[in-house]
């Protein structure tokens, strides 16, 4: 037998202690029934029970680490869950890099577990294959033994030599000798059949107890558990790899939901990993104890009348099957010698046609039986069983133990690294700030003026004070009013001389500006002082009155009255403007003493439809809501907008 490997020695050297931390016997003895049986040998029972306790204590070490890690995570979450202080970007980047590096290390540990799982599976399959070979050999021996027994019993009983010998004859001495020899042949044949029957009896029973199972039953049970364990372990390790992938994606996208999902899922995976690590640790130590002295454990099964280890050299003088087989063969040889002796005696006493034919048939049958027993003896050679036994040990204590040890190491590493990942991930999503979207339009939310010089006056006619946003629809209206083709407002007559005309080329009037901001600048600001602001307002009132009279004459529509009402409201608003509004207007407007202000924008409620409780996205209300305000022309009287929402302008739009 080969010497134990270094791995077997390392696993066997792990201390076996009881709950008092005293070293105990490390001999492999996994029979739990023996542990629970009350025996007279109290010391032996205590040693066996303590050995089982040592394996349980080894398995409880990862369980203790699991409890400690869960308590630490609970304390961390209780102390840090309400801490919302903003962390520096450099600290967040370092944390993300650490998460990715630890995740890669965890994936490597999981890969080691996958490799060990495959090695352990292949080793068990090799051991199961060798066990099936031994089982097949035993079944073959059983069938051959039954066949030899049946043939010997039936053929020898069918010859009926005694009836031929008992016929009346003048030489009674020869007759008595022939009858005695015939009975000796029958007796030897019966004893040979009894020996073969005892072999069949041992083949039929694996152990003496009725609760014991055969080797084939153990192999089938082991294959059933392995068919569940191998794919389940493979699926669990694959799930761990997927969770690591989810964590990397969550760190890359800075997704709080993904990181929280990993924290919750990783918590359950930590529990399973630590428990599996405990099972692998105890199993590896037990396998190391078995592989250290496997022959001793197998030979102990001889006392339990296990026929499968009876072929091994366990210190017994000879194999019991070989003994029974040799006994049967010797008895058949004696029966054959008796038949030959009967043939010699019957040649002179009985006619050849009467008894010689029967004796020759008996001799042929005994010769065939002897030949079959010789073949069976070669099959029972211990070298064949030893070959399968060595293959089974090589698969179990070689690749199988290596795979189990790798799974133990991978389980411990994965549990430890996964615990760190859950800690770091919980720290990440607690302090993680939501990253702004890349496609967000800053111009939609940026203020009109910076906070340092924001005006206190409202841009929109009906907007509250101290707001710095303006509707893009109002800009379109003012641009259309100020950028017309005529130099004076319609119906103003000599407005050019009184109020300062607006030239077509924009030299003295309002020309086209970038982003349509000319009307806005002149519609919001007065030239220089409060007096000029008052005069400009008066001029604006005269111009707008003339404009609306002319507009009423051409269109005859209800909208002109509403528009005049909005202009008057806008003029009153301009009269109530505080001095701060004048400062803002001076900063934004165009400084000219004789310029005419453009037409004021429509009422804010009319444009946005806020009176009816609906947001019309910068357009006039529909004609079915207010038929009187319906206007003919393009777009049904609605103002075209560049976006569906209000556009907040920046300072770059004006300068």
Swiss-Prot record:
Keywords, sorted A to Z: Cell membrane, Chloride, Chloride channel, Glycoprotein, Ion channel, Ion transport, Membrane, Phosphoprotein, Transmembrane, Transmembrane helix, Transport
UniProt note: phenotype after gene disruption: Death during development.
Residues carrying a glycan: 18, 25, 171, 188, 211, 326, 372
Catalytic activity: chloride(in) = chloride(out)
This protein's GO CC annotations: chloride channel complex; membrane; plasma membrane
Feature: compositional bias, Polar residues: 465-480
GO biological process: chloride transmembrane transport; chloride transport; negative regulation of locomotion
Topology term for the membrane: Multi-pass membrane protein
Pfam families for the chain: Tweety
Subcellular location: Cell membrane
Modified residues (Phosphoserine): 597, 599
Positions in the Cytoplasmic compartment: 76-95, 253-258, 423-655
Compositional bias of kind Low complexity: 450-464, 526-539, 546-576
Sample GO molecular function, one term: intracellularly calcium-gated chloride channel activity
Highest taxon listed in the record's lineage: Eukaryota
Segments for region (Disordered): 446-576
Inducing or repressing factors: Down-regulated by the miRNA miR-2b-1.
Extracellular side: 1-54, 117-231, 280-401
Principal location listed in the UniProt entry: membrane
Start-end of Gly residues biased regions: 482-509
Protein family membership: Belongs to the tweety family.
Purpose of the protein: Probable large-conductance Ca(2+)-activated chloride channel. Modulator of embryonic movement.
PANTHER family, alphabetized: PROTEIN TWEETY-2, TWEETY-RELATED
The protein's name in its UniProt record: Protein movement modulator
Species of provenance: Drosophila melanogaster (Fruit fly)
